[in-house]
Amino acid sequence: MAKFELPNLPTADDAL
């Protein structure tokens, strides 16, 4: 999971 300096939001990467 590529976690950048962004808030914990439901992204496509998180759905995987």
UniProtKB/Swiss-Prot annotation:
Class of this enzyme: oxidoreductase
Family: Belongs to the iron/manganese superoxide dismutase family.
Descriptive protein name: Superoxide dismutase [Mn/Fe]
Provenance organism: Bacillus cereus
Keywords: Iron, Manganese, Metal-binding, Oxidoreductase
Catalyses which reaction(s): 2 superoxide + 2 H(+) = H2O2 + O2
A molecular function (GO) term: metal ion binding
Upregulating conditions: Repressed by acid stress.
Quaternary data: Homodimer.
The protein's role, per its UniProt record: Destroys superoxide anion radicals which are normally produced within the cells and which are toxic to biological systems.
EC numbers for this chain: 1.15.1.1
Essential cofactor(s): Mn(2+); Fe(2+)
Cofactor remark: Binds 1 Mn(2+) or Fe(2+) ion per subunit.
